[in-house]
Amino acid sequence: MIKYAEIYKIKIENEIRYIAKVYIDREEIEDESFGSPTFEETAKHVLKDCVISNYLDMTETEG
């Protein structure tokens, strides 16, 4: 089975974080989700055994 990851750029208390949510067949695998302060570190972690399917910048939607 192929694992997919969506990476979200979010802002928590004025700090940017990149959160990866891992899925198999649209079911989130919460214990494999990962977060870090850099996109590169997050992508490197999930690319070990996942395909990145989406990148969503949630900071652009904040008002």
Question: Language-model segments: what does each one mean?
Answer:
Residues 1, 59-63:
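Short intrinsically disordered terminal tails
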Residues 1-19:
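Short N-terminal "domain-start" leader segments
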Residues 14-32:
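A short, structured beta-strand/loop element
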Residues 27, 34-59:
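A short, charged, amphipathic alpha-helix used as a generic interaction element across diverse proteins
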